[in-house]
């Protein structure tokens, strides 16, 4: 049997969903930054738009899902690393947003797929999955309330680099609201 709703019931169901979504948005004052997460695109393309970039073996900083990564030129290769700045206009070779990685775990010698690349991991085959498409839209939590909420659209803003949650493999990058 197929469940069918009248137009009136559909409208009521949609109104309830809209109200619930609105209530959730209004209640989002919990300070729990999660980095940048892809939510859509400017065009009609797919959200499966990540590329692979090598991660430097022995990278001193952990990289987790939602972190902003930059290109790093080494003497023999170009790799990525977690961006440590605030993106306030300083010269940085921004690459994209880290979504996960694969590497051979030096402790188990097993190929590992993870949202988290541990700090100081020595793995010559480490590859990051990075969303680097300029048409992707992201969501990010701000670190506070904006003084003029109507004046935030279409603007650039610096970010705040929080300490990554390496247990869950989630970034703590947030948007600087000041």
Please place each PLM-identified region on the residue numbering:
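Surface-exposed, low-hydrophobicity beta-strand/loop segments enriched in small/polar/acidic residues
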Residues: 23-178
């Amino acid at each position: 049997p197929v469940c069918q709703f009248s137009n009136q019931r559909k409208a009521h169901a949609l109104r309830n969903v809209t109200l619930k979504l609105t209530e959730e948005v209004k209640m989002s004052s919990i300070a729990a930054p999660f980095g940048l997460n892809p939510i859509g695109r400017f065009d009609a393309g797919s959200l499966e738009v990540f590329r692979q970039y090598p991660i430097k073996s022995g990278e001193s900083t952990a990289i987790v899902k939602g972190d902003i990564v930059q290109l790093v030129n080494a003497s023999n290769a170009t790799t990525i690393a977690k961006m440590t700045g605030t993106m306030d206009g300083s010269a940085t070779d921004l690459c994209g947003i880290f979504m996960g990685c694969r590497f051979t775990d030096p402790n188990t010698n097993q190929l590992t797929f993870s949202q988290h690349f541990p700090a100081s991991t020595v793995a010559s085959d480490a590859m990051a999955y990075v969303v680097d498409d300029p048409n992707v839209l992201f969501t990010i939590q701000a670190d506070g309330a904006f003084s003029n909420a109507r004046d935030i659209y279409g603007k650039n803003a610096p970010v705040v680099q929080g300490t990554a949650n390496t247990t869950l493999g989630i970034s703590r990058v947030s948007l600087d609201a000041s």
